Amino acid sequence: SPEASEDEIQAAFRPNTKALFGETIANPSIEVLDIEKFARIAHRNGVPLIVDNTFATPVLCRPIEFGADIVVHSTTKYMDGHALQMGGVIVDGGTFDWTNGKFPEFTEPDDSYHGTIYTQAFGKAAYIVKARTQIMRDMGACQTPFGAFLINQGLEPLPLRIERHSQNADAVAHWLEKHDKIESVSYPTLEGNPYKERAAKYLPNGCSGVISFSLKGGREAGARFIDSLKMASLLV
């Protein structure tokens, strides 16, 4: 949980823990991650902080600037913008020391790649080079050329789109908060939201387009609401 204390997070570490992971904006709770706190704990334990920045996109937040070592995105969401392809992105900040003794796969020869020692051959780029040359080769997670083209098309208007998404979500969240059939609304810009101050630090230009809310009336009310939607689709 983003609200776990440093002691609670520390207690969860094991000798074989290899990374600390979090989401800039959590799905579906819309909690905002204290990136600097999690980076501090990760580095104290000699592991990288990996942040899923899908909801925020690089337009609203750049986690590496707050101490994250690796950032991942599902490009199928906002980066695409049209739901036309499936893909993902890994961004390596080049900030983590892979020679600290916990990651022999970077410091010992890779027999499948002519005995390459990634930290010696590529320095700060060791992680991302290994991901591209060995891991992608072995797992086959390769974007199609046309899929990459569609992503590029979506990236061009991304700053404008995510600005409008954030403005719309803010307006809808405030409207829902006042509705008599709504039990609760979670969106960081609302007064009283526990993440409002943190969002002002990490997401000063908007909090993306996803809202979480609960209806009065429980499951039956939720089912009626979903079945009554005209402009939105039920997607899982």
Predicted regions and their residues:
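Conserved PLP-enzyme active-site core in the AAT-like
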Residues: 1-178
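Conserved C-terminal alpha-helix-loop-beta "cap" of PLP-dependent enzymes
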Residues: 162, 181-236
